[in-house]
Amino acid sequence: AAGYVRGIQSNGIAACPKHFAVNSQELRRMASDSVLDERTLREIYLTGFEIVVKESAPKTIMSSYNLVNGTYANENAHLLQDILRRDWGFTGAVVTDWGGSNDHALGVKNGSTLEMPAPGGDAVRELLAAVKSGKITEADVDARLDELLTLIYDTHAAVQNHSRSFDADAHHALARRAAAESTVLLKNEDNLLPLAPGTKVAVIGDFAETPRYQGAGSSAVNSIKVDSLLGCWAESGLEQVGFAAGFDRQGKPDAAKQAEAVALAQKADVVLLCMGLDEIKESEGLDRSDMCVASNQIELLRALQKVNPNIVVVLSAGASVETPWANHCKA
């Protein structure tokens, strides 16, 4: 992480490691309280942050939604002041997660610099009232203002001189290479793979048309170009006998789609079945309740095997999945 931060900031912009700290679950992440002793906190949960702060001096850190020992991380003086700034020497700005400010004035007092999203005049009025009431001091506000202005000045030149043009084709080629080199072959019964040129293939599975290549939520990006299996078929040298979605992406049973896929499979030498986890399974704000591929996909696999045993499963998932169904495919 330290090397990554150095690489980002070498371009004159700010890196923002997150989420500080003990953000160990997504379910109820805005209300959960991570309760732990000091040794566990420092030796297990904070070690990664300590390394990145001391070795690469990130200009910002993002606080987490959760409470730590009863206090919201974004208002936690022990985390933001005692450990981050005093013990580690962090001099940058602390940024809230999106909507992660519970008490803005208390956050400012205890080390939170920037509230996101921008709350407009509400934050100003809240801070003015807090200063007048004695809840916080002008010195608290000044300290956060110094951090914010330093961030603005340090990144101003890079922002002003930033070119929005880049070599999209080169970036795409690198992404394709990364995808190819990270593919893992788990099984290849009867040496079914690689498929010989001209092999008649039935392409089945919603993911063949709309691939899963990233998570959902705030991590999702709008790509300039995305390669789908169907879109790249001309490069394969294989004969496609047809495509069928085969299953509902969100896991609902669909007998008609399954029947269409089974009929198509009977026309092919090999079935290429694209399975995986959908966007709902892999999004922020929740934790998976199991490690299973949706049951409608497994039911489809079993139905296809009855009419064509030569099945290659292409499994797309951003996390581990159980594969008790692997005996129903050859590769």
Annotate each language-model stretch with its function.
Residues 1-331:
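Glycoside hydrolase catalytic-domain context in secreted enzymes
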